[in-house]
Amino acid sequence: CDWSSDVCSSDLEPRDRGMKLSYSPVKELALENNIPVYQPTKLRDGTATELIKSLDPDILVVVAYGRILPDDMLEVPKYGAINVHASLLPKYRGAAPIQWAVLNGDKITGVTTMYLASEMDTGDIIYTSETEIGEFETSGELFDRLMIMGAELLDRTLRDIEAGTAPRTPQDHSKASYVKMLDKSLSPIEWAKTPREVIKQIYGLQPWPVATAELDGKVFKIYSAEYTQNKTDKAPGSVVSAGKKGIEIACLDGETVLITELQAAGKKRMKASDYLLGHPIKVD
């Protein structure tokens, strides 16, 4: 295929822990390869649509743009506008579908290519690609895998659209679900849940905002945990044991989980057993 590209990118955004403003990776790559970059500040006053018309595109490809395109813009390209979404639509429309798939303990997720429509993530499906979620896979690790899957699926989608062989299947809106953006209010671990729910919270909130727990009066970020076969009569959230294997915490119905990696305030991320060598934690 003989393809050429123009890029529309979001403006400068905070992209590190210091909230330093920088270009998006897409814009950086485009500039490095002398690909024209456009950054419309408004989408609904007609100027952005006129810009797209002037470019006379065959197709619009939208990935993680963060803004809904107006209907008149979607009608400009010969082949329409398509999107890559990191879930198996119509499940998990909206923000953070990857994280919520992990948080909810899903075993299967994937990516979807679809045509854009007036409402968010409601357009006709072109292709989907599935993958299993690892039991101890973080959202960040899953993101990296889905990113590659999405790129491969997008390549197939574009080639088949050009060839006229791409399918178009309306979504079953009765099966739709929506997920919200993450925030730090989700971080405190809810110990009065099953061990699997606790572990999925820990792995689902990485790399951000990260699960937290208060242990012996101090708040820790929790990065890794394991299942145990132990039972306890202690209340959820109680420290059952703390030693060479890690820190064992009571959950729902007397079951426990073992925290194996954490980070104390002002300290580096480390194994729980290493932290305990210099900072004993009281058993409840």
Positions of PLM-derived features:
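Short, structured active-site "lid" loops
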Residues: 23-37, 62
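Donor/substrate-binding cores of folate-linked one-carbon enzymes
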Residues: 59, 63-178
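Active-site-lining helix/loop region of Rossmann-like oxidoreductase modules
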Residues: 156-214
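Internal alpha/beta domain cores that form substrate/cofactor-binding pockets in large enzymes
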Residues: 5, 13, 36-55, 60, ...
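Short, small-residue-biased leader/transition segments that mark boundaries at the very start
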Residues: 1-9
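Glycine-rich phosphate-binding loop and adjoining beta1-alpha1-beta2 segment
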Residues: 11-28
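An anion-binding loop in the catalytic cleft
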Residues: 192-284
